């Protein structure tokens, strides 16, 4: 009996051991590739010596699995878990498969809110919020708002904005949070070692590049403040012109040119409203007072779908709303200009205002300086002044609803005078020539923004922006010749006026999801053009003649709709896909409708490296014509018509970024194709022509390609950057240059910019900026003849052979400044001394035929400004 009981116990123990008793420690190899589930089950049964039962309803159709030298039981568990199953032992070596129980989904809690600067209450645009727990990054939008996911457990958060102290916070991921986070201004001294080390550890992850796309740059007010001061003040457009891919005009030339594009291909926005001419002093200064600038964005590769109507760049400048807590102001007086600004609350925490004004007195100073500096190729009678004013009112109805009202005006006048006297045995001749240009911008805008829920921003925008231009040319000659019965006293005067005006009403929606951001919008624009009112008044041989020839004003409409999807994949790849559809109605009942697709990809390579790729297609429905031959430049804005098609641009951009603790490096390339470009026909000038502008222009194609490099030092006493651009830009017009390709005006092969600032301590700071650019191309005449018309017998008509067949000499200039700042109890004051064009290099602004001492005409380059010392004093209270 005892023996029978012992045998029974052994049998029971064997049955309990059961499963896998034949191969308890056997390692198996198995490779299943797209096989049926039953075949996979048979393979495991054969390998493990077991029987597997399951319901067909839980079995997938096809499966794949691979293991090498894996214990049999572990291999089965891995296989079943991969397809959401597990098993249960029923008896012996028999198991039954079943589905894994569904895990309870954890609630997805979010953090949202606004980030602002503590001293003023200004909402911060582009502030970065990083969550160390889930490695997610978010950036504040134009209203300073952000939203991001929280992980379960503790979330360590960092709020960072350049020039402000970073803030760290810890939140539990057990609920939703809505915050208003204040960041404190960092003093002008070098950051403490502790702060630098914290931010250094973060930057090694490379996440501070996560919000950028190919060909984009962001300038905060702190970064602009660290750039060299130009004639006593910092300048946002000057800072942008030192970036790669941006070519500044020689001594001005009315602005900056991006990736081989024309001036009108830059969409310059002030708080989202277009500015048609954003420059003072023919491009030396921007028309934006640096005191009002909060930050600025430059886009030259991928354009978000909400932007359209331009081909080369988007320059979006955000102005300050005004201090929410107390009245503050600043005033500055210098040798060249003075400015004043005032800001503060009208209703505390509800309504704020900001006003500023600036005026130069270059018209009094320049001639005095020029007369004391030897400038052989410059005119001694330059005249110039500029003025600008800003006003902004912001009212917050609640934490969700905000209204902003803005006004802006700028005015410029510049030109030159020349008087020559020639004496010979034949007699005496006196000539007087004067050219002046006057232009200005005026805008009004209203923006209403509303936060719906915690993840949807709605913006309603309305504005009117207007630009006017006037060009005057006067010529007078007195001849007192021996043998003639009477003295000759003739006069001729030309005048051209033109302008453009935009009115827009638009609605924009921005929605934030877990890994996705969606943007939608639509708008209607009314474009009004005054192509040109031309006037000729002459007094020849005591006979007065007056002629007017004008083009009729035109009004066109443009409707646009856009949508954009931004997706973040696994924290390493960001994809932007957008589409914009623009419909343009011309005055001659022609309709143009074009889709404008765009795509951008940004992916992380290693720890600190990012690769960017983007492709875009854009259309532009109006054009800016310039007479860059000889003489002062003049503007003419014209619309697309039935015979003049919109300009089309297709661009491919690619780039590589490397970001380290104190340094960053970038290398980018681009390929760009144009169609339907416009230029004046050879020998044609709209100013002195009595025909419609459409009859004197030619249409053609173009292309640009180039490489851009930038190295930047971002922290420490010494800060700055070096940029280099290699650029090639060509044009092909059937009716120009015999149909052969020719370089564009903006084909400047090599462009170098070095910008640096050194802070000796909290008080003293030294800045320097040096820029070099290859000479611009221009069309040089091979001959000339005098107008045969009796009303205008002194007008010289030039004969051209080729297009842009001559190069100006290279442009280079060094600007330096040193500043001293002292903070007192109730105010701070700053002295700035600087030198513009420190080594007095005479950069050509334009070329002009002038009479020499022998009475012969010769080609001379005209320089706008020689070496210019500057001393300014400013206070902030």
Language-model region placement:
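Periplasmic N-terminal accessory/gating domains of Gram-negative outer-membrane beta-barrel systems
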Residues: 80, 139, 165, 172-180, ...
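Short, acidic, small-residue-rich periplasmic hinge/interaction motif at the N-terminus
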Residues: 83, 90-108, 112-122, 127-130, ...
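Short, acidic Ser/Thr/Gly-rich low-complexity loop/linker segments typical of extracellular
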Residues: 134-145
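Face-selective signature of the C-terminal outer-membrane beta-barrel domain
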Residues: 394-413, 435-590, 604-606, 658, ...
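C-terminal beta-signal and adjacent terminal beta-strands/loops
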Residues: 675-676, 763, 771-794, 809-815, ...
